[in-house]
């Protein structure tokens, strides 16, 4: 009986509407990361950028590396962010990993984006900003850097987009190992734009 009561308490405030948003927004994010960032040479920061770095150097699918790194970040911050956050984040993470695995089966739709890094940076930022932003807005996170950014933002009382910028810059620094220097400027543009979009969406209510 105690176990049943605990499960009811865990899910009593969970909204079906938010679960649906978590699934579709994480799929939107996965589509953009695969179709734009993984083929354009314009990377993301945070855990998303780390998944691309691991894919490049060790051929580890972001569907796997993303799930592992996200789980570590979530377990580190669940006490601060609460039970509802964990439920929505689990749905978002599974949605992202499953969607990315599905999209990996197909050829890129826009391979020409490699020759248009500015457009890739802008389009990629829209996919990442909206996908991650909608998840953050409902109180969840599709990736570990979102969970980490939400935790740090709450602790230091700073707007989330500036926390994103700091963590993204760290990953971009590591990405110098496989991304040409001239493309890092476009990567910086995409992380700044996506972070601002997340910040705007976070302030809105569903």
Question: Predicted segments — roles?
Answer:
Residues 2-206:
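Core subunits and conserved enzymes of cellular information-processing
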